[in-house]
Amino acid sequence: MTDHTMKKNPVSIPHTVWYADDIRRGEREAADVLGLTLYELMLRAGEAAFQVCRSAYPDARHWLVLCGHGNNGGDGYVVARLAKAVGIEVTLLAQESDKPLPEEAALAREAWLNAGGEIHASNIVWPESVDLIVDALLGTGLRQAPRESISQLIDHANSHPAPIVAVDIPSGLLAETGATPGAVINADHTITFIALKPGLLTGKARDVTGQLHFDSLGLDSWLAGQETKIQRFSAEQLSHWLKPRRPTSHKGDHGRLVIIGGDHGTAGAIRMTGEAALRAGAGLVRVLTRSENIAPLLTARPELMVHELTMDSLTESLEWADVVVIGPGLGQQEWGKKALQKVENFRKPMLWDADALNLLAINPDKRHNRVITPHPGEAARLLGCSVAEIESDRLHCAKRLVQRYGGVAVLKGAGTVVAAHPDALGIIDAGNAGMASGGMGDVLSGIIGALLGQKLSPYDAACAGCVAHGAAADVLAARFGTRGMLATDLFSTLQRIVNPEVTDKNHDESSNSAP
């Protein structure tokens, strides 16, 4: 996967993402425009994959290359030929089929044989000396679980001690969705070509891609002139959204935020949302909650303004606020329902999370000034489907949420997806497994709410908030690891993250001082 620390990624990964079907249609056009053949593109792909293998595993002396019966297999034949040419021992296993190979793959296969290479059946006993496996079985056209013979090869590769380099995409991972309906290669490195595919960034991608590498195959000039439907957002882009503040700015310039929630026993949720909003730069934060929570919240975070939630305090606060966040610890009893009914007609930007989403699923409506932030379980309730259906196509489900509920939808998870009308779609390339703990969603709500108050558009606030949230966790993970990370731990790094001009300066200075 891409580098999720604050360091610059050592491998250049683009921020544009293409559906695999669009790449397949576009690569022929690109080749024609640039005077290339598709076979020349295959040779470039094989060369790029070979270089990744050599760079990552310079001491590997016996490569096992697994070739499928398609153009992904053609790339594998090129890798095998290049490895053999430099004296590496290569064992190549090929999947046979009654169908002829695509023209380009057939040429690559012929070149391998002409170079003295041999092709073995896929069911042979693997040599004991194999110390690198190259996965070129299945490409980006896969739509379902691999068939049994390929699944057996995948399982064998995964159980073998040799590292695996996947060509274009790990076999068994769906390029459009990141779903894994059957067996899937667990790669240590993946080299993908021409453009990033969404399935490399969301769903199960992080479990199976390893370190992600990219090569445009020389199509940069053509790619630069194309519009893409999906964007990858990462920590490097925070400076695009979060500019240095004017020296004369005051607290009123940075947003007046009201946060509503914290029913009996859930004061922690509303406290985390409130502090996250402050740490993300909100000018003023008012919390409306149960009276029993007032003293503990003020003691824990005196910068918050904390009031009992009543109809009068809610009415006055809605008039005062620039932004409303509702849901953390709200509950689904009458207390929370009445507050949500009052907030529904708020005309300014608002964010609904947690129990607000569970209540929304019962009484759905469409609001264009609202950001919703469901995890897969909440998204399933909002769309009336199963969690498995949500996870099978996260991008499509995020778009469905926008179609049904309006505004901006943030479908949380590894490779969070952010969608907005009419066709804005982003994948968040930040965050880690340490965030799989209680309270992380409450912190995210506060961050996005704060950015809404700082005049970012709902879509930009959602994208920037998710990136800042994940990047703060990545700093912690790089230092302490992912196990045992708490939501409140993010506060120690969040302030750094939302001031990217300081972060960039510190990074540049440390880079310049390095020996």
UniProtKB/Swiss-Prot annotation:
Where is the region NADPHX 2?
Answer: 375-381
Look up the EC number in the record and give it: 4.2.1.136, 5.1.99.6
The GO terms describing molecular function are: ADP-dependent NAD(P)H-hydrate dehydratase activity; ATP binding; metal ion binding; NAD(P)HX epimerase activity
Keywords of the record, alphabetical order, are: ATP-binding, Isomerase, Lyase, Metal-binding, Multifunctional enzyme, NAD, NADP, Nucleotide-binding, Potassium
Q: Which Pfam families match?
A: Carb_kinase, YjeF_N
Region (NAD(P)H-hydrate epimerase), start-end ranges:
1-227
Residues annotated to bind (6S)-NADPHX 2: G329, D442
Q: Which CDD domains match?
A: YXKO-related (cd01171)
Indicate which residues the UniProt annotation says bind ADP.
412-416, 432-441
Looking at the record, which segments are called ADP-dependent (S)-NAD(P)H-hydrate dehydratase? 235-515
Question: Catalyses which reaction?
Answer: (6S)-NADHX + ADP = AMP + phosphate + NADH + H(+); (6S)-NADPHX + ADP = AMP + phosphate + NADPH + H(+); (6R)-NADHX = (6S)-NADHX; (6R)-NADPHX = (6S)-NADPHX
Kindly give the PROSITE patterns that the UniProt entry links to this protein.
Answer: YJEF_C_1, YJEF_C_2, YJEF_C_3, YJEF_N
Cofactor binding note from Swiss-Prot or TrEMBL: Binds 1 potassium ion per subunit.
Stretch list, region NADPHX 1 = 71-75, 139-145
Q: What residues does the YjeF C-terminal domain cover?
A: 234-501
Under InterPro entries, the record lists:
Carbohydrate_kinase_pred_CS, CARKD, Nnr, Ribokinase-like, YjeF_N_dom, YjeF_N_dom_sf
Where along the chain is K(+) bound?
N72, D135, S171
YjeF N-terminal domain span = 23-225
Tell me the residue numbers annotated for binding (6S)-NADPHX 1: D168
Q: Name one GO biological process term.
A: metabolite repair
Xref: HAMAP family? NADHX_dehydratase, NADHX_epimerase
- Family statement: In the N-terminal section; belongs to the NnrE/AIBP family.
Q: Which PANTHER family match?
A: ATP-DEPENDENT (S)-NAD(P)H-HYDRATE DEHYDRATASE, ATP-DEPENDENT (S)-NAD(P)H-HYDRATE DEHYDRATASE FAMILY MEMBER
Q: What is this protein called in UniProt?
A: Bifunctional NAD(P)H-hydrate repair enzyme Nnr
Q: What is the lineage of its organism?
A: Bacteria, Pseudomonadati, Pseudomonadota, Gammaproteobacteria, Enterobacterales
The encoding gene:
nnr
